[in-house]
UniProtKB/Swiss-Prot annotation:
Protein family according to the UniProt entry: Belongs to the RecA family. RAD51 subfamily.
Keywords: ATP-binding, DNA damage, DNA recombination, DNA repair, DNA-binding, Nucleotide-binding, Nucleus
Alphabetical list of PROSITE patterns matching this protein: RECA_2 (PS50162)
Positions bound to ATP: 109-116
Record GO biological process: DNA repair; double-strand break repair via homologous recombination
Protein's recorded name: DNA repair protein RAD51 homolog 2
Cell location: Nucleus
Taxonomic superkingdom: Eukaryota
One GO cellular component term noted in the UniProt record for this chain: Rad51B-Rad51C-Rad51D-XRCC2 complex
Reported induction: Induced by ionizing irradiation and treatment with a cross-linking reagent, cisplatin.
Taxonomic source organism: Arabidopsis thaliana
Pfam families hit by this protein: Rad51
């Protein structure tokens, strides 16, 4: 709805032409500005501005629907509401089948914990034949930090799915379905994802991976406050792209040190603010996701990868379909493997805090375990 063209709404021709002349093309362009900003830019009176905004808002607002009609619509379109299997049984069961289509899924954790390994395994799964639990499609893998390894992907395939990868030519075919892009700047990345919207459906793309979004923004050498408007546009575009294309979009996020003022950024953490003050030694060692609270609200699924006392753990920290659960895992030649399919339910501040204790001795597996 936000991308609906103003020129196609039936707005009065005169005011519609003024919007077009000032390069305000979509409903989002108009509704992202204040009335005073529009009045100054378009050089028309407040009465006309308010009338136009009211018309555009009404034209783009979806009609009211009952819970019953939404359920019926979901049932009718169940084939569009699938999941990409992670081939980690406990995690797939928790997520009702795997990484869901049509939404943003975030992997957040310290360097070397296994985020890129997880992404490469997902890319492999998406390219696999349906008969073997895959999506039989292509993958676009935006490799910002040059961590993608074709050799590692093939190794994972040979170890995890030998019955498929030992077939003649299958390894080359699977690797050939993964298109790797390496943007050199945020501007280059922005241009690339804008071009993807039409090609995704035409080329049977079944997964988009961005590894990592944090690295793209940190390369701009701008303070965090100045990066937020840029991040806001990318959040909106990626959510729209996921919904439009009905594919899973997986984005990795790095971590930074948590300061004491951030302990109440989540509602449940506000309740333990006093506890935090009395226990700073424990909480000062925690990390938080680098992209901040606005990004955290934008993602539908958040998987936190952390290390406690030398043990890797993957947590389902945010999901509309399950309680917060934690699974211990390790990384082998086959990729990430759960040590137990029975997750431990989490409560309180442990859901979103990120540990990296005893982690430094685990980051050199195959030379790349990010």
């Amino acid at each position: 709805m936000a991308n609906k063209l103003i020129g196609e709404m039936g707005l009065h021709t005169k005011i519609s032409n003024i919007f077009a002349a000032r390069n305000i093309i979509t409903a989002k362009d108009a509704l992202s500005m204040t009335e005073f900003e529009l009045m100054e830019l378009l050089d028309v009176g407040m009465k006309e501005i308010r009338s136009a905004i009211s018309f555009i808002s009404e034209a783009t607002s979806p009609p009211c629907q009952s819970a019953r009609s939404l359920l019926e619509k979901k049932v009718e379109n169940e084939h569009l509401s699938g999941h990409l299997p992670t081939h980690l049984k406990g995690l797939d069961d928790t997520l009702c089948g795997g990484i869901p289509f049509g939404v943003l899924t975030e992997l957040v954790g310290p360097p070397g914990i296994g985020k890129s390994q997880f992404c490469m395994k997902l890319a492999l799964s998406a390219s696999f034949p349906v008969a073997y639990g895959g999506l039989d499609g292509r993958v676009i893998y935006i490799d910002v930090e040059s961590k993608f390894s074709s050799r590692r992907v093939i190794e994972m395939g040979l170890e995890s799915f030998p019955e498929v990868f030992h077939l003649k030519g299958m390894a080359q075919e699977m690797a050939g379905r993964i298109l790797v892009l390496r943007p050199t700047s945020l501007a280059n990345f922005t241009e690339s994802i804008q071009e993807l919207k039409n090609s995704i459906l035409q080329n049977q793309v079944k997964l988009l991976v961005i590894d990592s979004m944090t690295a793209l923004l940190s390369g701009e050498n701008k303070p965090g406050a100045q990066r937020q408007p840029q991040l806001g546009w990318h959040i909106s575009f990626l959510k729209s792209l996921a919904e439009f294309s009905r594919i899973p979009i997986v984005v990795t996020n790095q971590v930074r040190s948590q300061n004491r003022d951030e302990t109440s950024q989540y509602s449940f953490q506000a309740k333990v603010k006093d506890e935090f003050k009395d226990n700073t030694k424990t909480y000062d060692s925690h990390l938080v996701a680098a992209l901040g609270i606005n990004w955290a609200h934008a993602v539908t699924i958040r998987l936190v990868l952390e290390a406690k006392s030398g043990q890797r753990i993957i947590k389902v920290a945010k999901s509309p379909m399950s309680p917060p659960l934690a699974f211990p895992f390790h990384i082998t030649s086959a990729g990430i493997s759960l040590l137990s399919d029975n997750g431990t339910e989490l409560k309180g501040p442990g859901i979103n805090t990120i540990h990296a204790r005893g982690h430094s001795d685990m980051i050199n597996f195959h030379g790349d375990c990010s």
